[in-house]
Structure formats: structure tokens, C-alpha cells
């Protein structure tokens, strides 16, 4: 059910975002405790502010009220993805080149399933992450299809 909701909401919100020159980062429909939350994460090259989130929230809320695709009561939240934005699409990886990232893989690569370091290259098929191991740097090549999830990672170095 929640996958269908995510797809329907993604299709509904895209024209709103196109009109405001914003990008859809992710949509989540999750139950936390007794409450359902519909979370829409938006961004742009310059970031997003509270006014843009409010515009998207109001426009999407109207569309959701008209179409009524969700049977449960829920809270709608529209926000930026934050500093540790998820990397969902290949274009997200391209934008993240030179930045610190955290990735988990479906299966071990060099005996590990979690990697944090600089995304030094991405050719659409292989993501290369330069990780620090004590005082050495090591390049890890991670096939795109083996990435379970990835996000930007804040570094305090």
C-alpha cells in the first residue's frame, strides 16, 4: 500500500515542483506509533526555504484533498532533505562528486558493507569512494546496483 501511495504522490507533486523550479528528492509514507506521515523532501541548487516548503505543502494538500488517494488519516510534511541528503538517482551521485558520502551495500565489498569517504568518481555504473584507514587512503569501487542506500555525510574534520 505505501509503495502505491509514494508513486501516486510523486506523480501529483512533480508538476507543482516543476512550476517552482524545485526537485523531488524523496517521498515517504510511514507509520510511526499510531500516526501515519506523508513526507515529501524537496530541494534545488540554491536550497529551499520555509516559504517554498509551505507553497508546495499547500498546493499538494489541495491536490490530495481532491483526489483522496490515501485512506488513512496522515500528517503531511514538506521539507528539505537536510545536510545528509539521500542519494537516490544517478544524477544525485554526479552532484555529490567531491563530497563526503556514506554508503551501505547489499553484499560485502573488500569485507565491508558500509563505507564513508569522498566520492571521487561516478561513471553511471561504478561509484569510487576514497576512504581513510588510519593514515592511509584507499579507493573502493562500488557497483551502482550493489548500493543499498547512500547519503551525503557531514564531516567535522
UniProtKB/Swiss-Prot annotation:
Any Pfam family matching the protein: RimP_N
Main localization, broad class: cytoplasm
GO BP, sorted A to Z: ribosomal small subunit assembly; translation
Keyword Ribonucleoprotein: no
GO CC terms in record: cytosol
Compartments (UniProt record): Cytoplasm
UniProt entry keywords in alphabetical sequence: Cytoplasm, Ribosome biogenesis
Organism domain of life: Bacteria
Keyword Cytoplasm tagged: yes
Matches recorded under NCBIfam families: PRK00092.1-2
Annotated family: Belongs to the RimP family.
Biological role: Required for maturation of 30S ribosomal subunits.
Listed name of the protein: Ribosome maturation factor RimP
Lineage of the organism: Bacteria, Bacillati, Bacillota, Bacilli, Bacillales
Amino acid at each position: 500500500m505505501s509503495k502505491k501511495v509514494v508513486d501516486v504522490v510523486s506523480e501529483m507533486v512533480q508538476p507543482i515542483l516543476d512550476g517552482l523550479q524545485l526537485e523531488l528528492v524523496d517521498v515517504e509514507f510511514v507509520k510511526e506509533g499510531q500516526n501515519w506521515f506523508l513526507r515529501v523532501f524537496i530541494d534545488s541548487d540554491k536550497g529551499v526555504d520555509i516559504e517554498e516548503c509551505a507553497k508546495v505543502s499547500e498546493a499538494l494538500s489541495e491536490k490530495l484533498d481532491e483526489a483522496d488517494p490515501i485512506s488513512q488519516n496522515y500528517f503531511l510534511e514538506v521539507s528539505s532533505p537536510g545536510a545528509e541528503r539521500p542519494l537516490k538517482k544517478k544524477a544525485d551521485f554526479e552532484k555529490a562528486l567531491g563530497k563526503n558520502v556514506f554508503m551501505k551495500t547489499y553484499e560485502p565489498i573488500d569485507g565491508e558493507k558500509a563505507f564513508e569517504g569522498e566520492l571521487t568518481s561516478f561513471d553511471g555504473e561504478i561509484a569510487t569512494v576514497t576512504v581513510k584507514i588510519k593514515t592511509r587512503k584507499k579507493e573502493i569501487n562500488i557497483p551502482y546496483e550493489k548500493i543499498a542506500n547512500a547519503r551525503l555525510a557531514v564531516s567535522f574534520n
